[in-house]
Amino acid sequence: MRYFLLPLFILLFTQAFSQDIQQVEVIKSDKQVTELFDELGDKEIKIDVIDLLAQPALNIGYEKINDSYSSFGADLYLNLNDISSADSWAEKISLNPFYRFYFLNKTDFGGEGYFVEAFLKLSYLHYDRDTYYYGPDPGIPYYESEEIKTFDVAPGIGVGKKWVNRKGWTFEYMIGFGRFLFSDFEPEATFKGGVSIGKRF
């Protein structure tokens, strides 16, 4: 009897365990992912809340989801600070097209999880440049202030992460850096990043 009960117990346990496994689907197929983000929409509008609260500046973005693994879009940055403000960036207006590659945490909705972004900043810069000079007495320097207005281009790369809920609301953070190509006088490096809230449609 003992030898009969042991195989029976193993059989029942295995069947119950198999039923549990069948009820849990850990990874969705690409077709299911596509259906889910088609239901939510494959376009997204977002706004950077850090720029809005801290600068003030307006940074709005648009993103088009290609598939589960990639997207492209652009964001527009408008600096609302006065150029004399200590908090102001040199960039007054910036249009930033980008292309993203999503990886690791690709989940239900596509275009979600960790990403790497390649971007190109097309920037109009407006700032005051101070040039210091030394006369006969090196202990008494003097300087000239010059208002600079110029246009420049900065390629760059960034990393970040995005979350999407079942209502289509998105939350993301990102940090990236680029380098201006042409001018010798403006800041050589440029920053791109922030914390954004958006909506799929």
What residues fall within each predicted segment?
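Cleavable N-terminal export/targeting peptides
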Residues: 1-37
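Residues on the lipid-exposed face of transmembrane beta-strands in outer-membrane beta-barrel proteins
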Residues: 60-64, 97-101, 118-122, 155-161, ...
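Short loop/turn motifs that connect adjacent beta-strands in outer-membrane beta-barrel proteins
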Residues: 35-42, 68-69, 87-89, 104-113, ...
